Regions:
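Glycine-rich "substrate-gating" loop/helix at the edge of Rossmann-like oxidoreductase active sites
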Residues: 1-4, 29-37, 57-65
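Residue-level signal for the nucleotide or nucleotide-sugar donor/cofactor binding architecture
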Residues: 6, 62-65, 94, 151-154
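Conserved beta-loop-beta element that borders a ligand/cofactor-binding pocket
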Residues: 12-34
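Mid/C-terminal beta-alpha module of Rossmann-like enzyme folds, strongest
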Residues: 71-74, 79-127, 167-169
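Amphipathic terminal alpha-helices
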Residues: 154-169
Length: 169
């Protein structure tokens, strides 16, 4: 995963430093909203059956973005964004140990089981373990300031609740 991040950073830097274009890169948080992976039937079912564990201490920080906010930010960036790298995320980064149990509770499910990192590496691989235990959140301050963008769904808590209210089980 680290090599992939290095490659992404390299491409972002090359793009934003290109002399003949006003290159910009948008870094999106974890998408959520109707029809997204997080709220797809199989994922919700797995959460309800406690098949999505809390890995290690759940110390990974996640930033989320509602798909409607991502679309709005993209349109604004294309229309008036200057060169640079912009994080398109909500206002409330969250630790996995915070958002995963909260989502389970919103579904009326029991809290996720805890699984040690070593076991999760064997069962799910290093990538998932890193996401759940080491990921770092992004800040949307630059996107708000330079693009004039404001997420309509500023909190994942409220956004998750809204999506679940309109979703049919």
């Amino acid at each position: 995963m680290r090599r992939a991040l290095e490659a992404i950073r390299y491409l972002e830097n090359r793009l934003t430093a290109a002399p003949d274009i006003a290159g910009l890169a948008l870094r999106y948080g974890a998408f959520y909203g109707p029809g997204t992976g997080l709220f797809a039937g199989p994922v919700i079912d797995r959460l309800r059956r406690r098949r999505v564990p809390l890995i290690g201490g759940g110390n990974g920080w996640w930033s989320f973005v509602h798909v409607d906010d991502a679309a709005a930010a993209t349109a604004i960036a294309v229309e008036r964004g200057g060169p640079g790298i912009y994080n398109i995320v909500d206002d409330e980064p969250a630790l996995v140990r915070e958002w995963l149990p909260a989502l389970a509770a919103m579904l009326g499910a029991k809290p996720p089981r805890h699984v040690p990192k070593w076991l999760a590496r064997i069962a799910a691989g290093e990538h998932l373990v890193t996401l759940m235990t080491e990921a770092r959140a992004g800040s949307n301050v630059k996107a708000k300031r330079r693009l004039g963008w404001q997420p309509e769904h500023a909190s994942w808590r409220r956004g998750f609740t809204e999506v679940l209210e309109v979703r049919t089980p």
